Amino acid sequence: MLRTGAPNGDLPRAGEVHTGTTIMAVEFDGGVVVGSDSRVSAGEAVVNRVFDKLSPLHQHIYCALSGSAADAQAIADMAAYQLELHGMELEEPPLVLAAANVVRNITYKYREDLSAHLMVAGWDQREGGQVYGTMSGMLIRQPFAIGGSGSTYIYGYVDAAYKPGMSPEECRRFTTNAIALAMKRDGSSGGVIYLATITGAGVDHRVILGDELPRFYDE
């Protein structure tokens, strides 16, 4: 299994646990939708079918995890700790851009030791909903982003289906359809779909179970 963000495109170490994955985030006016599948594997074995890959960094900021499960969670934990201190010093919630910079810096600093890619998405009072990619020390804001091993199967779909100005419900449907398509094609993605809709009012968590997933023409 090749992992997005793995140094030099290397293969996983034997027995290592991976979130070999489909993750996605979409901006809308007033917030973001972030989603993921839930399969975790070690080699050929599925070790967790319902792992939530959406990890909170702060009250209105989440990251989506891919790569080595342990490495990705370690980066998320370090970033959450730094952002908590940052918020205490400023006496106000951190910006989403600040969170993305923290994740980017950790990922780049430990690029030879940790194999993970985190997508950062959230809401703040200055810029509203934002989505950032942080792979390999890069930092770029996008209206939507996909990642993980399953993303290679859905580039055509998301490019064709994305429309600027979508409502929160349209973004949830767009994210659900894209991840379900990836889960159908990618053997390293599967399980259920976790969704988080982040706005100034808070975070709305949803789980799309297996019998609720969209069905496509070949099923």
From Swiss-Prot:
The modification N6-acetyllysine is found at K53, K109. GO terms for molecular function: endopeptidase activity; threonine-type endopeptidase activity. CDD domains: proteasome_beta_type_6 (cd03762). The active site is at T21 (nucleophile). Its EC number is 3.4.25.1. Coiled coil: none annotated. GO terms for cellular component: cytosol; nucleus; proteasome core complex; proteasome core complex, beta-subunit complex; spermatoproteasome complex. Autocleaved. The resulting N-terminal Thr residue of the mature subunit is responsible for the nucleophile proteolytic activity. InterPro entries: Ntn_hydrolases_N, Pept_T1A_subB, Proteasome_bsu_CS, Proteasome_sua/b, Proteasome_suB-type. It catalyses: Cleavage of peptide bonds with very broad specificity. Keywords: Acetylation, Cytoplasm, Hydrolase, Immunity, Nucleus, Protease, Proteasome, Threonine protease, Zymogen. The 26S proteasome consists of a 20S proteasome core and two 19S regulatory subunits. The 20S proteasome core is composed of 28 subunits that are arranged in four stacked rings, resulting in a barrel-shaped structure. The two end rings are each formed by seven alpha subunits, and the two central rings are each formed by seven beta subunits. The catalytic chamber with the active sites is on the inside of the barrel. Component of the immunoproteasome, where it displaces the equivalent housekeeping subunit PSMB6. Belongs to the peptidase T1B family. The proteasome is a multicatalytic proteinase complex which is characterized by its ability to cleave peptides with Arg, Phe, Tyr, Leu, and Glu adjacent to the leaving group at neutral or slightly basic pH. The proteasome has an ATP-dependent proteolytic activity. This subunit is involved in antigen processing to generate class I binding peptides. Encoded in the MHC class II region. This is Proteasome subunit beta type-9. It comes from Bos taurus (Bovine). The gene is PSMB9.
